[in-house]
Amino acid sequence: MQKKTGFLLIADISGYTPFIKNHSMRKKPLIGKKIADFWDSHADKLINTLLEEIIENFEPVMKFNKLEGDAALFFLEELNGENQIQGIYDKMLTTREKFNLKVNSLQFVQSCPCDPCQQSKNLKLKMFLHKGFFLQTEIRNNQELSGEALIFIHRMLKNKIKSSEYFLFSEAVLKNLDKHLEFSLITQKVDDFGLSLIHI
């Protein structure tokens, strides 16, 4: 087990839960199993394709840890003397852009009338970034992360921001970002931490 200082990032596809719920067609007996299977396969394919797009874009800068349902968790150990945070922020911008392009291209290329394909345009991307201490443990060849920073970033997901597409940074991250960037400050209690959050 190793204690490290670094960055944790969660890229979360918003609109995923209602998207999946809408396509659980087996709950509607009149639809039939064949149509239900068809719709479910397209819903799964869309989400998997978008998650692959997110991972592919982030991996040059951060290490992919694991999928958490509709979200991907990344980490990066801090290196002294390097401005890693700016590189992460730049990658967040390009990943959001490529995610939206991928959503639009999937909808256009497939030209499919099924509900999952038609509703895919409602899928958006939220990203959360925090800096702190975390533990890294290898269990059966998998790198498992734990610790206070990991708890904190997951608490960041539970906020009152109404938008379905945004970046959310902790104060620890903001200290290292370009001072010329303009952010909106939101003060919100994070359970067991009581820290304010910054979002753009």
Where do the protein language model's features map onto the residues?
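Conserved small/polar residues in nucleotide/adenosyl-binding loops
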Residues: I198-I200
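Catalytic beta-strand-to-alpha-helix segment of the class III nucleotidyl cyclase homology domain
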Residues: L79-K189
